[in-house]
C-alpha cells in the first residue's frame, strides 16, 4: 500500500514538473511567438494563462511556484520585464493564487473566485505601478484596448477554470 501511495505521489510530482517546464518554455518563447505572429502576445497575459492552467491541473504548490518563478525566468531570458516591474508582477501573480484559494474557501464558487482574484490582484498591481512609476507609465499600461483585452482574457480564464474544476479535469487539492 505504501508503494502505491509513493507511486501516486511520484506521478503527481512528475506531472507538476512537466507542466512547470512547459510553462517556463512558453514564457521564454513568448517574445519570439509575438514576433512571428505579429501580435502583442502580452494581451493574452501568458504568465496568467500558465497560472490558470496550473490552478486547474496541478497542485496548489505548483501554482505558487510558477507565480514566483515565471516573471524571474522571463527577466533572465529576455530582460523583460525590468526588475521593479518583475517584482510587482511576481507579487501580483502570487496574490492572485492566494486570493483564489481564499475566496474559493469562503464561497466554493470557482468562476467568482478566480474572476475576483484576477481583478483584485490587477488592482493591486496597478496601484503599485502608480507608486513606483510615473502617471504616464500607468496610463500606458491601462489603455482602453489593453483593459478590454484583459477583461476578455479574465472572463475566458475564469470560464476555463470553472469548466475544468467542474468536469473533474482538475487536480484534487
Regions found by a protein language model. Give the residues of each.
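Hydrophobic transmembrane alpha-helices
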Residues: 2-57, 61-62
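Hydrophobic transmembrane alpha-helices of multi-pass small-molecule transporters
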Residues: 49-52, 75, 97, 126, ...
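Residue-level micro-sites within transmembrane alpha helices that shape
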Residues: 44-47, 91, 121, 149
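Interfacial aromatic-anchored transmembrane helix boundaries in multi-pass membrane proteins
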Residues: 27-43, 70-100, 130-137
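Membrane-helix interface "capping/anchor" motifs
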Residues: 55-67, 104-111
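Membrane-embedded alpha-helical hairpins and interfacial helices in multi-pass inner-membrane proteins
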Residues: 82-87, 102-173
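Short helix-perturbing small/polar motifs within transmembrane alpha-helices
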Residues: 1-27, 87-130
